[in-house]
């Protein structure tokens, strides 16, 4: 298995949150979102984890003094974030997993499955199915099912790509470092956001004949990002239900489970009794 490191993208401001606090420090069940992502990736990569910070970087660094950071002084997109991290990654790994820091439902099992499923690919990305794709990047496939590209929602033109698909980019990638080093300089920012998208690596890799794999994860909510207070609230409820279900299955007595709010990082022994 190729030596792999993880890169967590945590530089964005999160404008739609309408808060001065960095988006990854918004809390879910009392813990900042970034903590859940770190907890999911650290066991898989034996500490080979970097966090890209930008907006209010000092606040994020202070909240996680045990993490290693790369600075993205200008927030020019996900592709630009990977560019800034390349000097720190080169010589340390053969491929890199890139994941968004605003996915508080992410689990170690999902990360491990994705890394193992993408082992034979030059570049892989996770996809999920959504009834309403909203602002997610659309996965464009050829007639034979092979991946053609990921097109950001605001740039999607049905005249060019066909009817909008329900399969969307889940924001988790695994790419060979030598391929990233070769293709990143060719990414442009001629799009409506004026940003450098990491998703552009996919169409470039396809054009080069590289093995590009879209790892389908069904409707798994664990990969859903948080971009607004509404999505934050929904993620918290998903996580609360997951915690409650786990406690009940482990032998914890909950008398009013609908009222229980416990951090998934808390330890509750079997036989404990919680009244709400």
Which residues make up each language-model segment?
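N-terminal nucleotide-binding beta1-loop-alpha1 segment
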Residues: 1-19
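Active-site glycine-centered loops adjacent to acidic/histidine catalytic or metal-binding residues
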Residues: 12, 102, 129
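Conserved beta-strand segments of alpha/beta enzyme cores
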Residues: 24, 48, 68, 146, ...
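Short aromatic/basic micro-patch
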Residues: 27, 105, 174, 225-226
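Conserved core of the sugar-phosphate nucleotidyltransferase
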Residues: 65, 106-192, 199
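Left-handed beta-helix
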Residues: 193-276
């Amino acid at each position: 298995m190729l030596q792999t490191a993880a890169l967590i993208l945590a530089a964005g401001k999160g404008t739609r949150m309408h808060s001065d606090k960095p988006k990854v420090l918004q809390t879910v069940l009392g813990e900042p979102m970034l903590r859940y992502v770190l907890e999911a990736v650290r066991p898989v990569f034996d500490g080979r984890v970097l966090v890209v910070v930008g907006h209010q970087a000092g606040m994020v660094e202070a909240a996680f003094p045990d993490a290693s950071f790369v600075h993205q002084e200008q927030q020019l997109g996900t592709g630009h974030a990977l560019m800034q991290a390349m000097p720190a990654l080169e010589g340390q790994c053969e491929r890199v997993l890139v994941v968004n820091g605003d996915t508080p439902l992410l689990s170690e099992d999902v990360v491990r499955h994705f890394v193992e499923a993408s082992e034979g690919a030059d570049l892989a990305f996770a996809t999920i199915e959504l009834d309403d794709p909203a602002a997610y990047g659309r996965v464009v496939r050829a007639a034979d099912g092979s991946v053609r590209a990921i097109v950001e929602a605001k740039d999607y033109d049905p005249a060019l790509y066909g009817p909008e698909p329900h399969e969307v980019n889940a924001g988790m990638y695994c790419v060979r470092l030598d391929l990233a080093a070769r293709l990143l300089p060719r990414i442009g920012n001629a799009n409506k956001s004026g940003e450098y998208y990491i998703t552009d690596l996919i169409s470039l890799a396809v054009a080069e004949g590289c093995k590009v794999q879209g790892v389908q994860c069904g409707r798994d909510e664990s990969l859903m990002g948080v971009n607004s207070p509404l999505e934050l609230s929904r993620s918290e409820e998903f996580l609360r239900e997951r915690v409650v279900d786990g406690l009940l299955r482990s032998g914890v007595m909950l008398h009013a489970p609908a009222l229980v709010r416990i951090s998934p990082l808390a330890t509750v022994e079997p036989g404990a009794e919680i009244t709400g």
